[in-house]
Amino acid sequence: MEIQIIRCLQDNYSYLIVDKAKNIACVIDPSEAKPVIKYLEDKNIHLKYILNTHHHYDHVGGNKELKEKYGASVIGYKGDKDRIPEIDILVGDQDIWHEENFQAKIFHIPGHTLGHICFYFYNEESVFTGDTLFSLGCGKIFEGTYSQMYNSLMKIKALPEKTKIYCGHEYTKQNSKFCIAHDQDNENLKVKIKLIDEKLEKNLPTIPSTIKEELECNIFLRSGTEENFSKLRDLKDNF
């Protein structure tokens, strides 16, 4: 399996997981269809599945066109069946989604939205976190509560440290400014910021991160308590 980052819209990331042996793929959160189709056509790959972490338009905007073009099945959270366009397959917390050679465990991680999920592709040691966990940050709380978001982050935090994190946006530089402002003596964070700057100078994605890196550097995962997390989230909203 190969994971390919697809840049979409202004700062979104969609992801293709490609089974190179079968020349088929699934796509995570297609913000728009065009860049996904271009990659698939350039590589002569057939799209079989569309996986959505949540219902926001910048994560499902390509569903309809991709489904019509490839006959791909759309997978999303059962509680969002009326909000995810073209949905076919409903999944819930702790389910294992397994089609072809694609296997992922589903975690329900409400907070950013009430129906947010992540896809943990355990064989690939990779988790697709949408807008819940970012590199050095976390998503804004639009529908859920502070408690829900904190507990959702704790679920992701518990994954193996070597797990790679693929999130929904390139927000890492701005997130790093907030982290260092509130964690000025964190040497691991200083090293990570240097690497982030080097990647961005070369127009490279700062993604993936890893659970280990986020445990060392992400102030939201290091907050310690729900109360501290809530205060930090409020500060970030006005940063």
From Swiss-Prot:
Its EC number is 3.1.2.6. It catalyses: an S-(2-hydroxyacyl)glutathione + H2O = a 2-hydroxy carboxylate + glutathione + H(+). GO terms for molecular function: hydroxyacylglutathione hydrolase activity; metal ion binding. InterPro entries: Clx_II_MBL, Glyoxalase_II_hydrolase, HAGH_C, Hydroxyacylglutathione_Hdrlase, Metallo-B-lactamas, RibonucZ/Hydroxyglut_hydro. Keywords: Hydrolase, Metal-binding, Zinc. Binds 2 Zn(2+) ions per subunit. Thiolesterase that catalyzes the hydrolysis of S-D-lactoyl-glutathione to form glutathione and D-lactic acid. This is Hydroxyacylglutathione hydrolase. It comes from Pelagibacter ubique (strain HTCC1062).
